[in-house]
Amino acid sequence: MVITVAKELPPAYEPEHIARALKLADVIAARAPAHDRDASFPFENFADLSREGLLALTVPAALGGIGAGARDTARVLGIIGKADPSTALVLSMHYIQHLVMARSTRWPGRLSRKLAKETVEGVALINALRVEPELGSPARGGLPATIARRTATGWRLSGTKIYSTGAPILKWYAVWAKTDEAETRVGLFLVPAGLPGTRIEETWDHLGLRASGSHTVVFDDVVFPLDSEIDVRKPDDWKVPDFTQSTVHAIFVAAIYDGVARAARDWLVTFLQERVPANLGAPLASLPRVQEVVGGIEARLAINARLIESFASDFDDGFQLTAIESNIIKLTVTNNAVKAVEDALQLTSNHGLSRTNPLERHYRDVLCGRVHTPQDDSTRVSAGRLALGV
């Protein structure tokens, strides 16, 4: 591992789960190029993570999990994100759901306990399915087309969800849908994967995060129990963001893409130390211009490390940040990560864009940080409106 000014910030102690993540990182990283090339799903990574107890990282200790907070979870996601961000993204969505379950007064206790038990005992991942072909992301407003119809024997769910990260491995879906009641409600329903009428369409063929399995999930009159409502409310009641959801989503997404930039930085440093052009007679690392650019990368990653560390610690300490503050952290860290990898490409020219080297994969992956909700324009507009009082 390359040690630099912008090294990852370790906690004051090294918990066992951090050591386990570090142990798995090399194995996961070795698999990443093939899964990227083939756009195949890394099932074996999740078997390994389960065996090390890391799928239960954010499950409360009282329910048999590790009970990690945002700080340690961000550290694990940074480690796994550096190895394979597709795996880390699926993992982060699962972690977010369990943190929300543990802190929410709306999640039915019986359901959260059931999912916690399954996660402790095996590979039982969950993710929220929210994005739709027409609606796009619900973060920008609007009601979903996916509809849950109440019957005497259960809910009947119909609709289509796109960009369903982890679709090949998910055991549970938290589906964002509206009801057919006289007064429409909207919210999350817990739906087991694989029920009759459910199908996965393998539509994910992306520039980056190609192994994330973010396919389309279609529900065609899928029947599930009436007591599977997670949190369903009147549409206007959703105007205030969930603090836990918005905060940890920002932290975890930021940590993953910072990890990608660190993987790019490590490869770059080794390349510059070892590359000796014939007309120079010395490593590229000896050039002041190269040192300046690498120093700029170090500065961005050092800022990222401090932001993620302090923000996650604030969350763990009970300090409640606003959604705008959370979103600004995500914007800053992901854009720093993108710029760091762009600068690495600038220094390496054709070598950096060659499929024989990992830098082009890191670049494709890090660009995906900009498309995660909230997008940069929404964050800047919200911050600007608040500052201007409009």
State the predicted function of each range.
Residues 350-390:
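Glycine-rich phosphate/cofactor-binding loops in nucleotide/flavin-utilizing enzymes
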Residues 19, 259, 295, 299-302, ...:
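Generic structural signal for well-ordered, non-transmembrane alpha-helical segments
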Residues 206-300:
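Glycine-rich beta->alpha junctions and the first turn(s) of the following alpha-helix
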Residues 160-200:
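A short core secondary-structure module
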Residues 8, 12-15, 252, 281, ...:
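Register-specific recognition of a single heptad position within extended alpha-helical repeats
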Residues 43-51, 57-160, 165:
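Glycine-rich flavin
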Residues 33-36, 302-332, 345-353:
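C-terminal helix-coil-helix/basic helical segment that borders enzyme active sites and/or dimer interfaces
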Residues 162-167, 248-252, 369-372:
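Glycine-rich phosphate/pyrophosphate-binding beta-alpha loops
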